[in-house]
Each structure stands twice: as structure tokens, then as C-alpha cells.
């Protein structure tokens, strides 16, 4: 929390009618670019114009190495601010603290217990501080052992709080999230689960700005899959995926599903720009990034490919269209891996 509040050592000035920006960043000891030469971090959407080091101005070239304490002046395209900040200033993994500090697991039947272990793994391997379990009172038919003892056996030494309901409604989940600091809602996806349930959870996620993980017990997360989009904000699915990959030492696979050539438009140039930004983020986080290009129906192809992933991270991005919402709903139901939905 203190890290999130720490003021960034960044000065910014827009020019060219807001189409460009000049920023000055002080390089910290944990910056991803510290010790790197400019030729290693070059990009088409920003340029390093000058360094101020030990009271001297340095006009940099490809072999100039960035050092701790440097004041770096960067000129960048509009919209690239957060990406450049992440690249140069460095950001310790902090997900899901941007959304909330606790994990909420919803258990509606005994079958959901297999997903409880995944929530324990998730809590331990993110910056979440505690685990809350919203469960039915009659979760077990036989009642041979107490619910508390069963949870303790599954969650090992992970601390948790139990909250009981006779029957868990969507309204109960929404109320719990609004009254607590929840960073992720964990919900088990079962075969035959209704689309309306998925839709309701996504609506809660968007309304409360709380990620929801549709759990399918595909942990540990060694490979994370994402759909390429052009949203690189601090709490975007792209940023969250890289945050998780860095903290879990996981690889990332970015999937671009294009329309047939005769239907393609200027979107192809946006995809190229997004790919370049993803490659820059992979370089700064030292994460293996694989790119997959496919053609056809985005939702179906990504769902089919998800057997290669342990976790899929998706969102509607900046495109809040009917089609993008349907894509998210389809993937949440049909993905072979657990799906983390990030609200936009």
C-alpha cells in the first residue's frame, strides 16, 4: 500500500496540441532499464532525448548506458505514457492491490472445494493479504466433519474467514464486494453453467471494478494467455498479465485473431503498435513472450488455444461493444484454463 502511494519521480509536459508529451523520469535502483544501453530498449513510440547525470547534460546515443540517479528526458506519442512509465520507472508487482486487498471465494456446493486450493495458490502468489470464503451452510451432505476443519485441511496454514449463507445469490456476492476490500472474486465454473450466471458476475465485476476469476483448477500458472488489445493502462488486462507473469515467473502467450483479409481495416496498424508495446513490456519485465497469429472467430479460437495456458487474462479493453462482451462471456465458459477477467 505504501509502495502504491509513493509519489513517482516523474515530471510531464504535453505539447503539439496534446498529441505528444515530454517526460522526465529519475531512474531508481530497481528500474527495469537500469544498466541497459539505449539500443536495447529502443522503440518507435518514444525517444530518449537527454540524460542529466552528476550535474552534466548528456546527449545519448545507442551505446549510452542508463544508470541509477539519471534524470532521463523522453519524448513520446500521446497514449504511451503508462507504458513508458512502467518501462523506465519500474513497478514492483502489486496486483491485486489496485482493486482491493482480499480474495473472495464463493462456494455453492461440495464440488467447488477443488477450486479452494487454487484460491490458496493465488492468494500466496499475489499481493493479496487475506482470503474470505462465502459458503453455503449446508455445503456438505454427510456432515462427517466440520466445514471449518475441511477448509483448514485444504488451505493449510493460509488464514481465512468464513461467511455463511443459506443460499448464495448474485446480490449476496455484490453486497459482500461493496462492503469489503476485494481484489478478486473467485468463482468455480462447472459444466453446464448458465450464461446468465457468467453475465451477472461480469456485471458485478464492471460495476464494482473488481476482477473475477472463473476457476477451473488449472494452477500453478506457468503459462499465461492474453488476447492482444490496445489498452495499456495501469489496471488493464495487459498490465495485470505482466504483473502476474513477473511475480509467478510465468511465460506469456499473446494471441492476435484477425478477420479474413477482405474484412480487415486500419485495425492492423493498431495491432502492430500493441505488439511492439507488449514486446517492450516483456523486455522490461524480463518475461518470455510468445506471439500467436490466427484468423477467424476470436472467442472460439482463443478458447480452443486455452489448453496451452494455465491462466487466461481477458477484458473488453477500451472497446465496450456488444461483440467484445460476448467474446468475454464465451471465453469464460468455454476456456480450458482458469480465466481472470479484468474490468475496463
Regions found by a protein language model. Name each.
Residues 61-71, 76-83, 172-220, 302-344:
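Gly/Ser-rich helix-loop-strand patches that form or flank binding pockets
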Residues 92-145, 149, 225-268, 279-287, ...:
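Small/aliphatic-rich secondary-structure junction motif
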Residues 143-155, 200-203, 270-282, 322-331:
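Short, aromatic/basic amphipathic alpha-helical patches
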Amino acid at each position: 500500500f505504501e509502495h502504491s502511494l509513493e509519489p513517482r519521480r516523474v515530471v510531464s509536459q504535453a505539447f503539439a496540441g496534446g498529441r505528444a508529451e515530454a517526460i522526465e523520469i529519475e531512474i531508481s535502483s530497481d528500474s527495469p532499464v537500469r544498466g541497459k544501453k539505449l539500443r536495447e530498449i529502443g522503440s518507435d513510440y518514444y525517444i530518449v532525448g537527454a540524460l542529466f547525470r552528476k550535474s552534466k547534460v548528456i546527449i545519448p546515443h545507442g551505446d549510452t548506458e542508463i544508470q541509477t540517479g539519471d534524470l532521463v528526458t523522453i519524448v513520446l506519442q500521446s497514449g504511451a505514457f503508462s507504458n513508458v512509465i512502467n518501462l523506465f520507472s519500474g513497478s514492483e508487482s502489486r496486483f491485486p492491490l489496485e482493486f482491493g486487498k482480499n480474495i473472495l471465494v464463493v462456494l455453492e456446493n461440495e464440488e467447488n472445494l477443488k477450486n479452494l486450493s487454487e484460491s490458496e495458490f493465488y492468494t500466496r502468489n499475489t499481493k493479496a493479504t487475506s482470503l474470505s470464503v462465502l459458503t453455503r451452510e449446508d455445503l456438505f451432505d454427510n456432515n462427517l466433519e466440520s466445514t471449518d476443519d475441511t477448509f483448514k485441511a485444504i488451505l493449510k496454514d493460509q488464514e481465512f474467514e468464513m461467511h455463511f449463507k443459506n443460499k448464495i445469490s448474485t446480490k449476496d456476492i455484490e453486497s459482500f464486494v461493496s462492503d469489503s476490500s476485494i481484489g478478486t472474486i473467485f468463482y468455480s465454473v462447472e459444466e453446464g453453467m448458465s450464461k446468465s450466471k457468467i453475465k451477472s458476475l461480469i456485471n458485478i465485476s464492471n460495476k464494482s471494478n473488481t476482477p473475477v476469476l472463473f476457476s477451473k483448477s488449472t494452477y500453478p500458472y506457468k503459462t499465461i494467455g492474453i488476447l492482444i488489445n490496445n489498452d495499456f493502462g495501469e489496471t488493464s488486462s495487459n498490465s495485470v498479465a505482466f504483473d502476474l507473469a513477473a511475480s509467478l515467473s510465468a511465460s506469456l502467450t499473446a494471441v492476435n485473431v484477425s478477420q479474413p483479409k477482405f474484412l480487415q481495416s486500419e485495425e492492423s496498424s493498431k495491432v502492430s503498435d500493441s505488439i511492439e508495446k507488449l514486446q517492450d513490456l516483456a523486455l522490461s519485465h524480463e518475461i518470455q513472450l510468445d506471439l500467436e497469429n490466427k484468423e477467424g472467430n476470436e472467442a472460439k479460437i482463443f478458447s480452443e488455444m486455452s489448453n496451452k495456458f494455465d491462466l487466461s487474462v481477458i477484458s473488453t479493453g477500451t472497446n465496450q461493444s456488444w461483440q467484445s462482451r460476448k467474446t468475454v462471456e464465451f471465453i469464460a465458459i468455454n476456456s480450458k484454463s482458469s480465466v481472470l477477467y479484468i474490468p475496463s
